[in-house]
């Protein structure tokens, strides 16, 4: 066992750039169906089920490569990570369209993730938050809002 560990190659930044960043791309690279692609969560070690694998890609999250081992993030750990980051790295809150003043960018050009589940907000979700005057939070130098799924989960419509 120790001999095998000694010969493991370390990933360079160039290597990482060439590796798949989504589960769908990984499945295509391996030539297997997406449903057969089982990947452990980086945080809890549980293997993502098919629905979680689809959600991971839908949220536009990126695979984590450690040497040549791949990891993702399960649904529960996405929520836990979002909460941890919010509690530890919160910077500021703005309401609705004030995000454009705070960032200096148009709402169309601002990348925003859900503060609850880490999903990448689409333009309709961003405009909905602006129109309703909902808060946007700056956390770890990135903007967070609320996605349509979490908004309905918390009955905030």
From Swiss-Prot:
List the Pfam families hit by this protein, alphabetically.
Answer: E6
What SUPFAM superfamilies does this protein map onto?
Answer: E6 C-terminal domain-like
Annotated keywords? Activator, DNA-binding, Early protein, Host cytoplasm, Host nucleus, Host-virus interaction, Inhibition of host innate immune response by virus, Metal-binding, Modulation of host cell apoptosis by virus, Transcription, Transcription regulation, Viral immunoevasion, Zinc, Zinc-finger
Residue ranges annotated as zinc fingers (unnamed) are 41-77, 114-150
Task: State the InterPro entries in the record.
Answer: E6, E6_sf
Asked if the record carries the keyword ATP-binding, the reply is no
Q: Where in the cell is it found?
A: Host cytoplasm; Host nucleus
DNA-binding: is it a keyword of this entry? yes
A molecular function annotated in GO for this UniProt entry is:
DNA binding
State any GO BP term from the record: symbiont-mediated perturbation of host ubiquitin-like protein modification
GO cellular component terms?
A: host cell cytoplasm; host cell nucleus
Q: How does it assemble?
A: Forms homodimers. Interacts with ubiquitin-protein ligase UBE3A/E6-AP; this interaction stimulates UBE3A ubiquitin activity. Interacts with host BAK1.
The family this protein is said to belong to: Belongs to the papillomaviridae E6 protein family.
Cite the HAMAP family for this sequence.
HPV_E6
What role is this protein assigned? Plays a major role in the induction and maintenance of cellular transformation. E6 associates with host UBE3A/E6-AP ubiquitin-protein ligase and modulates its activity. Protects host keratinocytes from apoptosis by mediating the degradation of host BAK1. May also inhibit host immune response.
Instruction: State the name under which the record lists this protein.
Output: Protein E6
Annotated source species: Human papillomavirus type 5b
**Source organism lineage?**
Viruses, Monodnaviria, Shotokuvirae, Cossaviricota, Papovaviricetes
Recorded name of the encoding gene: E6
